[in-house]
């Protein structure tokens, strides 16, 4: 999946979002609270090769935000809120990243990260609601995948409570019905 394909998948997901949200039984939830920002995620599949995740990020300071590579190509849209995003890139699959850019991402921003040696962190300045799509995971044994890429599997993370899910879907139901600021 390249940048254009990732952004096209994101557009498809955003168009389908009101319909996807109506069937809450198809979504899995997770509270990612081992590193900041704390993330509340529900995810489902748009098709066999594209997962859609709806995130709520709690605020955190820039020095608390976890810099990480993703284990798959993806694209992101901010539906509400804003965050500071640091970007880095590793030269090899074993090196720590060098800083590339720091960006202020606002409501309506969209971007793709489809290069496996790219790292990023997000520092929400206010509570943020985002949509993420991702393609299949990069194989861990290929020469271009970073050795520190991680997933949430096997970390003992818990699902959202019923009340958290209701609140999460209510916000995304509201947000999915309005155009993005940068459309």
Regions found by a protein language model. Give the residues of each.
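A conserved mid-domain beta-alpha-beta active-site/ligand-binding segment of alpha/beta enzyme cores
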Residues: 159-182
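Short acidic-glycine-tyrosine-enriched beta hairpin
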Residues: 89-124
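Conserved short histidine dyad/triad with adjacent acidic residue
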Residues: 53-70, 105-106, 115-116
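Short, charged/polar surface micro-motifs in flexible loops or helix N-caps
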Residues: 48-51, 59-62, 82-84
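Mixed-charge (acidic/basic) macromolecular-recognition segments
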Residues: 142-159, 164
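A short, N-terminal "cap"/entry segment at the start of jelly-roll beta-barrel domains
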Residues: 1-52, 95
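A short hydrophobic beta-strand segment most commonly corresponding to one strand
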Residues: 75, 121, 125-142
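Short, conserved beta-strand element in jelly-roll/cupin
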Residues: 69-85
């Amino acid at each position: 999946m390249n940048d254009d394909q990732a952004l096209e998948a994101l557009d498809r997901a955003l168009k389908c979002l009101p319909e996807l949200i109506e069937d809450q039984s198809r979504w899995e939830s997770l509270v990612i609270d081992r590193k900041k920002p704390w993330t509340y995620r529900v995810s489902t599949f748009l098709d066999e090769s594209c997962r859609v995740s709806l995130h709520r990020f709690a605020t955190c300071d820039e020095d608390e935000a976890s810099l990480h590579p993703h284990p798959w190509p993806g694209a992101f849209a901010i539906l509400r809120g804003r965050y500071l995003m640091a970007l880095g890139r590793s030269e090899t699959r074993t090196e720590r990243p060098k800083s590339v850019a720091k960006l202020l991402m606002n409501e309506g921003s969209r971007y793709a990260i489809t290069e496996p040696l790219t790292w990023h962190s997000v520092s929400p300045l206010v509570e943020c609601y985002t949509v993420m799509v991702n393609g299949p995971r990069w194989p861990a044994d290929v020469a271009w995948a970073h050795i520190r890429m991680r997933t949430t599997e096997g970390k003992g993370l818990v699902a959202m409570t019923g009340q958290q899910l209701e609140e999460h879907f209510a916000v995304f139901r509201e947000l999915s019905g309005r155009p993005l600021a940068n459309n």
